[in-house]
């Protein structure tokens, strides 16, 4: 990263299935002058404890973040869903390096974005939530975490459905 000196760094999880143009998320990050932007989506409250769950204010700024909480906070006005992290992050490069260096020195840290870094920076940094939506409809886009054998199996069955929710072909 240092060799190329980018202004921003995009971090992705490797155990998810989705199709996303990252350009609008990066543009949102720049437009809001964020130090960090977290891709997010609504998940049913009963499944939210498997994810990082956040609360944002009316401007889209993340004000609370809990990694895999036992009692996830619901989205205000919608008791059936929580706002979950997709594990997709955009950082200002220097800010990212500063946080990684600081976290590396923390004896009791697991060195995990969701458990350690994000909750630690919320008060001092500008962390924004970016809701993942279909560009054409504005509806929540298809996204599946396939980090377990069961979730991987279910996602595969969805993708071979007669009319799958996600078109994996570019046509």
Over which residues does each language-model region extend?
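Unchanged
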Residues: 1-160
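Long, charged amphipathic helices and adjacent flexible linkers at domain junctions
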Residues: 162-171
């Amino acid at each position: 990263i240092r060799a190329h000196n980018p202004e921003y760094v995009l971090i992705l999880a490797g155990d998810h299935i989705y199709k996303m143009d990252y350009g609008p998320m990066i543009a949102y990050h720049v437009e809001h002058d964020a130090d960090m932007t977290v891709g997010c989506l609504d998940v049913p409250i009963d499944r939210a404890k498997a994810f990082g769950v956040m609360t944002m204010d009316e401007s889209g700024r993340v004000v609370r973040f809990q990694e895999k909480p036992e009692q996830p906070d619901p989205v205000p006005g919608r008791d059936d869903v929580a706002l979950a992290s997709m594990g997709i992050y955009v950082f200002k490069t220097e800010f990212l390096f500063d946080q990684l260096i600081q976290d590396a020195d923390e004896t009791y840290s697991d060195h995990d974005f969701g458990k350690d870094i994000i909750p630690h920076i919320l008060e001092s940094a500008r962390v924004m939530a970016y809701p993942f939506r279909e560009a054409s409809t504005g509806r929540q886009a298809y996204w599946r975490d396939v980090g377990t054998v069961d979730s991987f199996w279910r996602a595969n069955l969805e993708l071979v459905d007669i009319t799958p929710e996600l078109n994996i072909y570019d046509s």
